[in-house]
A protein has these predicted regions:
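Short glycine-rich phosphate-binding loop at a beta-alpha junction
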Residues: 30-35, 73-74
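Generic secondary-structure signature for well-ordered alpha-helical cores
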Residues: 18, 22-25, 63-71, 117-125, ...
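N-terminal glycine-/serine-/threonine-rich phosphate-binding loop
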Residues: 1-32, 52-65
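Solvent-exposed alpha-helices and their adjacent loops that cap or buttress functional pockets
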Residues: 24-26, 108, 154-159
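Active-site histidine-anchored catalytic micro-motif
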Residues: 41-46, 50-57, 64-83, 108
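Glycine-rich, aromatic-bearing surface loops/beta-hairpins
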Residues: 114, 118-186
Length: 186
């Protein structure tokens, strides 16, 4: 992988997370899930061409932006680990998510989860979470880890590297019927 392509991936990842955060209106302590197929980023087929370099470039673009705002990064593993989540122990404890025993590797968990495991201060794996927003890079199906109700968010870019991206924020369910009010101004 060329240096120029790594820089492109990093910048696209940074831009995507920055744009999504601007629309999602997350608060300090919220959770942001990222599913990332490094294979798709480099133009391969999901699960077939894992690239630590691509995953590291995505991490370099996303992690500092989230850290600056005090938002927890949750890294979704691949299908071989049942799409488990790698997250900092402190975040999992805050939200009451139960730890499971597994350490991701590039071909069992994916390069993205492996990269995050190595970069996090005190990483653990959990089976499921309810994140406040997230980015799906390359068709990794993050929906199972989003809070209800997920709201699609369009960005100015539609790819990171060669991988398509889909983004979502979440909002509380609207309840109550015709007399209900949903804002203070109503």
């Amino acid at each position: 992988m060329t240096e120029a392509f790594k820089q492109q991936i990093e910048e696209e990842a940074r831009q995507a997370v920055t744009e999504l955060l601007a629309q999602a209106k997350l608060r300090k302590g919220d959770v942001f899930v990222v599913g990332c197929s490094s294979s798709e980023i480099v133009g391969g087929h999901i699960g077939k061409d894992s690239s630590l370099e691509a995953a590291q470039a995505v991490y370099a673009g996303i992690a500092p932006v989230l850290a600056q705002q005090g938002i927890w990064l949750a890294a979704q593993c691949c299908e071989h680990l049942n799409r488990a989540i790698i997250i900092e122990r402190e975040a999992a404890e805050k939200y009451g998510w139960e730890e499971v025993c597994v350490v991701p590797r590039p071909h069992a968990g994916g390069s993205w989860a492996t990269t995050c495991w190595k970069q996090f201060k005190d990483p653990i794996a959990v089976e499921e979470i309810r994140a406040h927003a997230g980015i799906d890079i390359g068709g990794t199906l993050i929906g199972m880890h989003l809070r209800r109700v997920a709201v699609p968010v369009r960005l100015s870019l539609s790819k990171i590297g060669e991988a398509n991206i889909l983004c979502a924020r979440t909002r509380p369910k609207l309840i109550g019927g015709e007399r209900a009010k949903y804002t203070e101004e109503d």
